Amino acid sequence: YNGDWEIWVQELDLRQMKLVGESMAIWKGAVKGVIWPEGPHLYKIDGYYYLMHAEGGTGPEHSISIARSKKLFQWFEGCPRNPIFTHRNLGKNYPVIYAGHGDLVEDGKGNWYVVMLASRPCEGHSSMGRETFLAKVTWENGWPVIAEGVGHLEDTLELPTKEYRFPEEVSSTSDHISFWEKKPDKRLVSVE
């Protein structure tokens, strides 16, 4: 670590589980002088590599920023609207604060969402107990837009889902070891 706030990428040899070659800085964060660009997630969507990450720590300046590149091993360009999501402008008394650390999810039917962390203040303070929140994502000019037309997390979110019931062999009195022993469905998991 060289003391700079950067996100790096380096090739991983999956057979030997070792890093190969030199690491390369691909992004320094969206905000000038940003602290803690962290928790990076990489996605390949429509020919671009997207790098989504948190900035500003886990307090009032917490946010989500994104950058993209056609190639993985080159400098990424930032979204012109970065940070693409934050509650920093809503004040400490807003019902949900410290929103950040997002992860994009596509439901297989073309609907996009972001799952993120945030806190609820109690009597003007935050215990920093973070909860998981979900918001809708749309795409404009190749960039994600979180909570379009709303700009903040909502109390409820309508989802296009059907009721799901776990199989009878799953019970609340079992530790479900057999479930966790199974290998992931290769149709659902990819490292490409």
What do these predicted regions represent?
Residues 1-192:
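Carbohydrate-active catalytic/glycan-binding domains of CAZyme proteins
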